[in-house]
Amino acid sequence: MKRHVSLSDILTGNKRKVRRQDALQITIDDENDTESGTFDARTAKHDDSSVIFLNHSVVKPIEAVSTNHKSAKEFLMTKRTKEKCDDDDDDLIVISDKSPKSETNCSKIALSQEHEDDISIISTSRIKSSLLNERASKIKNFLKHETTDTFKRLNSISKLNEIEPPLPLHQSIFPVGDKELSDRSVDIPLPFRTIPPLNHNFLPSDYESLKDKNSASCIPVRYQAPVLLGTNIKRNTTLTWPQLFKPVTLKQVLIEPKLKLRIKNWIETSFHTLEKPTLRNRLLNRINPNKQQGSGDELANFIVPDLEEDENLRPDFYRNGEANSSLSEFVPLMILHGNSIGKKTLIQTIMREIAGDDNSYQIYEVNSNMNRSKKDLLDILLDFTTTHYVKDSSKRKSDYGLVLFNDVDVLFKEHDRGYWAMISKLCEFSRRPLVLTCKDLSLVPSELIALASEQNSLFHTKKISTSTVYAFLTKYLKSLEIEVCDDWLRDVVKQNNADIRKCLMHLQFWCVDTEADLISSKNRLPVLTSTLGSSVKDISQLTDLLSINDVIGQATLNRSMVRQEIDSTTMTPEKVNTFQDQNLDDEMKLKFDYVIDYKLHLNDPNRQPLLPFELNIYQHIQEQLEARYSYVREANHRLDNEYLVNRFKKMTESTLNFLASRIPKYDHLQSARRTRNSKKISDILNQFKGIYNDETLNENAEIDLLSATTQQIKAEINPFVFEIAKSDANVKNENKQIFELHSENVSERRYKDLVYQLSQEGVLKNVWFNADPSIVVRKWEHLHSGFSKNK
């Protein structure tokens, strides 16, 4: 058995493994023992390293070759010094640089009898130095073969021979001894400029608001406590007032009367239409056009839903599979959008009036506070919309039922997954009406909006005016035998943004307690004697103050001192990036769920809007300016008059209709000269009779007007359109007079030829609007007459 040991192991008696593979090793052959007292040293090649094999046995002394008897220690001490080597590994037995044959015949080392355990060791620095020289030569040869193109200078600073040192960060030169550095002042000349003198001429009346705090500050007005005229049972109920005064009839719902009747008629018509099978081709062409028109893929419709296999649920085919051409086209979908309050109450009231009894109808309501995913609701809603609900089998009544989807514009990414796909599937198979309510119509799929618009089932509910809400609240309080201050009641309506439910809760909080003392407080504007003069200086001073106050208002608008909590359901970039992680499990997705929106919300804690109870210095200064310059307050008071607001709305509607009737370019009377257009000539004749064609209106006019503010419409658009309407009215009157002058001796049958001849000769002037301009003129005069009455 052979073992590999090092020379240090032999000298020290330790047996350990060799650390390096390229080190010289000694092999001891235990099986083939040599003669006692000798070392049989032989070499062998293992890979690239030389190994010495020593046949070790009991070492016996041999005859000395030299007469000088030296021990191993003395031999090493008299050996000349070799070059130092960087490597400090274990000593190795020197192998001669001669031929391999000489390496196998190793000389025997004589040992003296006095030192039997000593072995002559020769330093291996020569071998190590030769190995290092060979390695260095290989590196040099490798570098010679490498081209200089492989090494590129990464920076221009490597080409410089010298680099200037950077400026020291600290002072490196100090004065010698006790001398201190003397400071020297240097004058730097600046360009000469003159500063105009600031001469402000202030009047004592300008500081009246600071001298007299009682007249300038806001005086709290204490309203009277609610007067309870009697003991009313309704006041002691446990119900909230919105539930107590819930509308019972359709007339009590605070929505536009004409719109309520249109919605009721559509729901009634849908119930009668759905009693028979109907076609849904409009829907199928929009959500799945390949299914109706054919697809290039033969296996596009290979997987067929179970509902399509049931012939009873397919409304557009007979049971034998043949198409029914006599069926009507109808999809039971209605979209109710807008900022009005009470959409759900409106549907419930209409269903109660249609059914005639609370037990004869059923509304399946889907709210935003529940999981509205496709897997949670599709099967339940399909069962409800494709089967009849029978409450009492003995009395089989024709029950009425519909599905009401509330707040469809508020959708969560994970909780409401597959929501719109579920609604599309219900529209395809439902035998009951589907009603969708929302505020923002832009978050509803365009396919459903276009489908509802084609069927005249897209309804917009407008916000109710404050006067209507005030009248209803007065009626409710009167039924409860409660009297309140009218000014305070108007403030309640304005504070709650004309929301009837919030107003009722506000009133219940203050009026239900018989011991209520303080209702509210109001800021009374200071009454000052100074008014705005007619001089340019006064007007300039007012405009400067208003401009400065606007700057203050913009600077303090988003500077709230109250730190508000950030809504965890808001769609932020952090939430979107979190959902892009593929390793996110379903539980974490539900935890970090957010509302789907068409824009990302950036939460800036340093830009929070002012709360209603925080100090608004901009509003305070504005009130002071309005109190000082009375004309501003009078103008605002005139504009706040609801009677004038209604007139302004009518004026704006007439302006919009007039602009929408704009004749396209190259489509006026000049085109009639080249070709005889009977329809255009007929329109001209009708205009002479006072009949105007408003069928072809430009829809872009309303979109362009949406970007304008109310102030721009009042000050710029309406006056400008009024001047255009006056000019257009004069042109049409002149054309009418010219036509009447030339048609005295012409029969009525030849009126078209006469108009064509006059247009070719250029006698008739061009008109640019099809609408009646006199309507705009009348609305403008009606509006200004209202201003003159309120002065």
From Swiss-Prot:
Provide a GO CC annotation, any one.
Answer: cytoplasm
As for subcellular location, the record says: Nucleus; Chromosome, Telomere
Disulfide partners: none
A molecular function (GO) term: chromatin binding
**Cell cycle recorded as keyword:** yes
The UniProt keywords, alphabetically, are: Cell cycle, Chromosome, Nucleus, Phosphoprotein, Telomere
Q: Which InterPro entries match?
A: P-loop_NTPase (IPR027417)
Quote the Gene3D superfamilies the UniProt record gives.
P-loop containing nucleotide triphosphate hydrolases
Instruction: Report if keyword GTP-binding is assigned.
Output: no
The biological process GO terms on file are: DNA replication; DNA-templated DNA replication; double-strand break repair via homologous recombination; heterochromatin formation; mitotic sister chromatid cohesion; transposable element silencing
Q: Where Phosphoserine occurs along the chain?
A: S6
Q: According to the lineage, what is the superkingdom?
A: Eukaryota
| Regions annotated as coiled coil | none
Q: Which PANTHER family match?
A: CHROMOSOME TRANSMISSION FIDELITY FACTOR 18, TELOMERE LENGTH REGULATION PROTEIN ELG1
Could you tell me what this protein does? Involved in the negative control of telomere length and in telomeric silencing through a replication-mediated pathway. May have a role in Okazaki fragment maturation. Required for S-phase progression. Component of the RFC-like ELG1-RFC complex which appears to have a role in DNA replication, replication fork re-start, recombination and repair.
Family note: Belongs to the ELG1 family.
Complex formation: Component of the ELG1-RFC complex which consists of ELG1, RFC2, RFC3, RFC4 and RFC5.
Q: What is this protein called?
A: Telomere length regulation protein ELG1
Taxonomy, top ranks, is:
Eukaryota, Fungi, Dikarya, Ascomycota, Saccharomycotina
Q: Which gene encodes it?
A: ELG1
